[in-house]
Amino acid sequence: MEPAREPPARARPPPPAARPAPAAPRPRSPAEAEARGPEGLLRRSGSGYEGSTSWKAALEDTTTRLLLGAIAVLLFAILVVMSILASKGCIKCETPCPEDWLLYGRKCYYFSEEPRDWNTGRQYCHTHEAALAVIQSQKELEFMFKFTRREPWIGLRRVGDDFHWVNGDPFDPDTFTISGMGECVFVEPTRLVSTECLTTRPWVCSKMAYT
């Protein structure tokens, strides 16, 4: 009787091949790094990074244009106002007094050359937005004395028994004294004198200086 045969030995499977080690990552170029960075992601994702920048630039440009437009409108309005003022004669405000007028204190004075009666002199002053001179202080009177070579009319006249200035103020006899018995007053080099209003002589206008 033949002996029992042993079953053949099973062949062992070959061991699995070793996996190759992963390759080292390739260094990124600056362009790739920028593309993978936050700004690149924003550009790729369409979140509007570049759009946001251009939007801000557009907004700033619009704001600048609006500001320049407002400045242009303001300058135009100023020119219009200046033109209106100039047409009304306010261009004279550039100097304290009109031409041929003399500045003293806060007043402008006009000393006429031609002789006229008191009322004519008063009317002349009125047409030049002034009045026959009203003297309000001793210093003003002393200033007037310096320009009285031709003894001009001033804005002082008798009303009844008392003298009054043309602006309605009463005359103060304690401040000034008046010689003569006439109705209208003129200035001599050292005093005030009253005489007939129809007498012809130069006159002095006064008004407030431009400020």
From Swiss-Prot:
It comes from the Eukaryota. The modification Phosphoserine is found at residue 29. Gene3D superfamilies: Mannose-Binding Protein A, subunit A. It is found in: Membrane. Disulfide bonds join 125-205, 184-197. The chain crosses the membrane at residues 66-86. One of its GO terms (molecular function) is carbohydrate binding. One of its GO terms (cellular component) is membrane. Pfam families: Lectin_C. Residues 104-206 form the C-type lectin domain. Keywords: Disulfide bond, Lectin, Membrane, Phosphoprotein, Transmembrane, Transmembrane helix. Residues 10-28 have a biased composition (Pro residues). This is C-type lectin domain family 2 member L.
